[in-house]
Amino acid sequence: MEGKPMRRCTNIRPGETGMDVTSRCTLGDPNKLPEGVPQPARMPYISDKHPRQTLEVINLLRKHRELCDVVLVVGAKKIYAHRVILSACSPYFRAMFTGELAESRQTEVVIRDIDERAMELLIDFAYTSQITVEEGNVQTLLPAACLLQLAEIQEACCEFLKRQLDPSNCLGIRAFADTHSCRELLRIADKFTQHNFQEVMESEEFMLLPANQLIDIISSDELNVRSEEQVFNAVMAWVKYSIQERRPQLPQVLQHVRLPLLSPKFLVGTVGSDPLIKSDEECRDLVDEAKNYLLLPQERPLMQGPRTRPRKPIRCGEVLFAVGGWCSGDAISSVERYDPQTNEWRMVASMSKRRCGVGVSVLDDLLYAVGGHDGSSYLNSVERYDPKTNQWSSDVAPTSTCRTSVGVAVLGGFLYAVGGQDGVSCLNIVERYDPKENKWTRVASMSTRRLGVAVAVLGGFLYAVGGSDGTSPLNTVERYNPQENRWHTIAPMGTRRKHLGCAVYQDMIYAVGGRDDTTELSSAERYNPRTNQWSPVVAMTSRRSGVGLAVVNGQLMAVGGFDGTTYLKTIEVFDPDANTWRLYGGMNYRRLGGGVGVIKMTHCESHIW
């Protein structure tokens, strides 16, 4: 009775029961009885299984062609279905079956301009809520999802294509996104193209661009080039790729090359002497304009325009990645990144495996995740993350043995995996990865077995700090000399620590948090290699075992961990001048035993994903 006042019975007749009153008083709150009437016991119940089980049964009915009331004819394929299911999932079908269209009365409906297999996949999704987007179907699946107005599948296809972006295909993906009005994918493809222009200009796709799209690209202020010479060379290569067709378009395209920003030597010696430039009056005029700009600095304020505006400098900054770990009683695969320029934590692509006790480091601007524990098994697999594509790859060779609570660092172009445990014993084994050979090789073992060890690289040496020998936490420290392939014992820490955080900051090694024999630690200390001594540093505000430690844009940051009671997502930053730690926001996920890594990224890169 929407919109009408509620009426309640207050006159209870002699001998009436609560049910009598309820049936007589048909208006009012049906769940509330009048005063004086005993309230019956109630237990609201919502089934989590019901939607899934109902969908499973309806899908079985479809497969057995039971209660189907429509047949979709797509090419040579006939697909049996239920109008109500199609209408519930697709605005396209809802309009078709509930309006006055002829199809609303037909039992067979012909669907044109759609791929048979794509339609099958989308109908399967309507009945199962599951679909697999892959390289072989995305180009037919996205147009089909657009036609049927399945926004969720459109987003999934675009997300898949975002992860496939590469300098060799970004222009094709951009055109595909433009055709199907995928604005977010178009934006990201544009950003990717601008940032990777030096590689994109070498691709076949670049050479096949129509003139208007080439102009769109080279007109961008955010084009990432070392100098305007690269833009000019790219344009001339594009023209000469199909010279008869494109020669007349050269003046139009050259207008968007910022010739006044070229060096005088290049402008005169290369641009001005090029036969294609010399033979065209409009091109010669553009060269003369640039010469005047360079030769008459006093007149430059009067000559400002799009061609004299410098490309925006590409700002570089460091971005912190938090990888895997243990959260809410289970290993996790999630990864997030912190950008100091925006002061924001954002989720990025997850690893293919859950990893706690994972070793993380950065080599050649790629983030490596080594070993760990997935909640049931010890791992020797390795994954590699490319921030340019927001994609993890698993084609990295595995370590020779399973390792969790492993220390990982980069020295001399190699990735080192130090210690850890394999599920049977604590390890002193050390091996290093050569990315050129995709191969791990054993090097000298440590003198002590160490799990929960922290590692750092300083002065050409690899340091293994603390950890546990499988029985007790350690305060001992070893240093590896790659020239000698030997480990040497150095001064011990003041405190025994396992599962600590370690990083190099201001030419000293900082060791923070961890756990001793009895409790999680908030204390910190640092090592001076010049004196071979450890000295105490002010304690963090929280106890943190399984903490990550990293230096980001000159700031020492302690990330996550466990305080003895709670998994932490908070961050602390060390202020060396004030000799204090201060809280600095928090991650999206609580993380114990996760890894951290820092990658220097351009401003453009850091805002793509």
UniProtKB/Swiss-Prot annotation:
UniProt superkingdom: Eukaryota
GO molecular function, one term: ubiquitin-like ligase-substrate adaptor activity
Classification via InterPro entries: BACK (IPR011705), BTB-kelch_protein (IPR017096), BTB/POZ_dom (IPR000210), Kelch-typ_b-propeller (IPR015915), Kelch_1 (IPR006652), SKP1/BTB/POZ_sf (IPR011333)
Annotated GO CC locations: actin cytoskeleton; axon; Cul3-RING ubiquitin ligase complex; cytoplasm; cytosol; dendrite; Golgi apparatus; perinuclear region of cytoplasm
Each Kelch repeat, start to end: 319-365, 367-413, 414-460, 462-507, 509-554, 556-601
GO terms classed as biological process: cytoskeleton organization; Golgi to endosome transport; negative regulation of apoptotic process; proteasome-mediated ubiquitin-dependent protein catabolic process; protein K33-linked ubiquitination; protein transport; protein ubiquitination; response to interferon-alpha
Pathway: Protein modification; protein ubiquitination
The keyword Ribonucleoprotein is annotated on this UniProt entry: no
Quaternary structure and interacting proteins, as annotated: Component of the BCR(KLHL20) E3 ubiquitin ligase complex, at least composed of CUL3, KLHL20 and RBX1. Interacts with PDZ-RhoGEF/ARHGEF11, DAPK1, PML and CORO7. Interacts with F-actin. Interacts with IFN-gamma (IFNG). Interacts (via kelch repeats) with IVNS1ABP (via kelch repeats); this interaction blocks the assembly of CUL3-KLHL20 complex.
Name of the gene this protein is made from: KLHL20
Residue ranges occupied by any BACK domain in the UniProt entry: 170-272
Predominant cellular place of this UniProt entry's protein: cytoplasm
SUPFAM superfamilies (UniProt xref): Kelch motif, POZ domain
Subcellular location: Cytoplasm, Perinuclear region; Nucleus; Golgi apparatus, trans-Golgi network; Cell projection, Axon
Domain BTB: 68-135
Function of the protein: Substrate-specific adapter of a BCR (BTB-CUL3-RBX1) E3 ubiquitin-protein ligase complex involved in interferon response and anterograde Golgi to endosome transport. The BCR(KLHL20) E3 ubiquitin ligase complex mediates the ubiquitination of DAPK1, leading to its degradation by the proteasome, thereby acting as a negative regulator of apoptosis. The BCR(KLHL20) E3 ubiquitin ligase complex also specifically mediates 'Lys-33'-linked ubiquitination.
Effect of L148A: In KLHL20m6; abolishes interaction with CUL3
Keyword terms of this UniProt record: Actin-binding, Cell projection, Cytoplasm, Golgi apparatus, Kelch repeat, Nucleus, Protein transport, Repeat, Transport, Ubl conjugation pathway
Induction: By hypoxia.
Substitution effect: V109A: In KLHL20m6; abolishes interaction with CUL3
Pfam families, per database record: BACK, BTB, Kelch_1, Kelch_KLHDC2_KLHL20_DRC7
Protein name: Kelch-like protein 20
